[in-house]
């Protein structure tokens, strides 16, 4: 069984302690030689400056390719593309292009009058700008705004037709959910090898339930019961490691070539899952000196 490529998602820190945590997590996971790491972009572009700062910070690690997230919420086309140009000026050649979530309390997505109406328009504009590698979102468990599962596939195909290079899925808990999604994508003419499943190692069960409810990720009853039992017995971390490793292992057995991890700026569980999959970390020369 071949080893998959890896990528890791981080979020921009808010304070000096957060920057130290990000640095430590990125350094630990960069040692696994990921294809890239990405930095998220807050709702409504609320972390625009912090995202760029974090991307520059991560870009200082040797050999690390960084992707900046970019959304079209609450900004004009000119403002959005100025962020893309800032990424390029900082040496970034990868962008995760998303519609984005509206600011809290706004309700549904409302395009800016002078902004991009959706992610497809954003992708096309980025492709026209220059030599960006564009990653997009995909949703094995139906996107909350999608009419049905077929609509998700239609929308994903439009993203690839607009110029996307790869898709990173929302996290999920049942590998069969991903395989069914992959099969539907392939049937629609999408190259399924360009879809990387997203894995969220569970660091906090209560928070993950909230995340799942917000993004529409289905929670299999047996997984929920397992976490609840493990929490009562004080074995939540061990169960989380076993659950994420089993999920990743099944995906790789099923032919997946790239795994995308949502790290929440903590290396521990993600690092241990990678090790359990047989990945070897390579020490940095500076760490050995």
Regions found by a protein language model. Give the residues of each.
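Active-site-adjacent beta->alpha loops and helix N-cap segments on the catalytic face
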Residues: 17-19, 45-58, 76-82, 102-126, ...
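Active-site beta-loop-alpha junctions enriched in small/polar residues
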Residues: 10-13, 40-44, 69-75, 100-101, ...
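Conserved beta-strand positions in the central sheet of alpha/beta enzyme cores
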Residues: 38, 96-97, 135, 168, ...
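Conserved, mostly hydrophobic/aromatic
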Residues: 9, 37, 87, 159, ...
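Active-site mouth loops of central-metabolism enzymes
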Residues: 5-21, 66-78, 133-151, 228-242
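Conserved N-terminal beta1-alpha1 strand-loop-helix module at the mouth
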Residues: 1-39
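Short, acidic/polar
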Residues: 16-29, 51, 77-84, 147-158, ...
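Active-site pocket-lining/capping segments in soluble small-molecule metabolic enzymes
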Residues: 17, 113-139, 188-246, 277-288
């Amino acid at each position: 069984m071949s080893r998959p490529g890896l990528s890791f998602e981080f979020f921009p820190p808010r304070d000096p302690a957060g920057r130290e945590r990000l640095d430590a997590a990125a350094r630990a996971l960069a040692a696994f030689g990921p294809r890239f790491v990405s930095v998220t972009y807050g709702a409504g572009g609320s972390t625009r400056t912090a995202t760029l700062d974090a991307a520059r910070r991560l870009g200082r690690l040797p050999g690390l390719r960084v992707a900046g997230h970019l959304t079209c919420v609450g900004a004009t086309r000119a403002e959005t593309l100025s962020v893309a140009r800032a990424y390029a000026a900082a040496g970034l050649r990868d962008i995760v292009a998303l519609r984005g979530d509206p600011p809290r309390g706004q309700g549904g997505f409302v395009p800016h009058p002078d902004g991009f109406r959706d992610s497809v328009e954003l992708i096309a504009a980025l492709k026209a700008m220059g030599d960006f590698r564009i990653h997009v979102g995909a949703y094995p468990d139906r996107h909350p705004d999608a009419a049905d599962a077929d609509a998700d596939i239609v929308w994903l195909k439009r993203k690839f037709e607009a110029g996307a290079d790869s898709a990173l899925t929302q996290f999920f808990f049942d590998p069969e959910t991903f395989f069914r999604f992959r099969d539907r994508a392939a049937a629609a003419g999408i190259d399924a090898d360009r879809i990387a499943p997203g894995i969220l190692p569970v660091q906090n069960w209560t928070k993950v339930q909230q995340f799942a409810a917000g993004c529409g990720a289905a929670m299999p009853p047996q997984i929920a019961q397992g976490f609840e039992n493990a929490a009562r017995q004080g074995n939540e971390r061990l169960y989380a490691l076993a659950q994420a490793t089993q999920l990743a292992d099944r995906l790789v057995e099923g032919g997946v070539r790239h795994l995308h991890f949502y790290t929440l700026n903590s290396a521990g569980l993600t690092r241990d899952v990678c090790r359990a999959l047989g990945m070897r970390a390579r020490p940095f020369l500076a760490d050995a000196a």
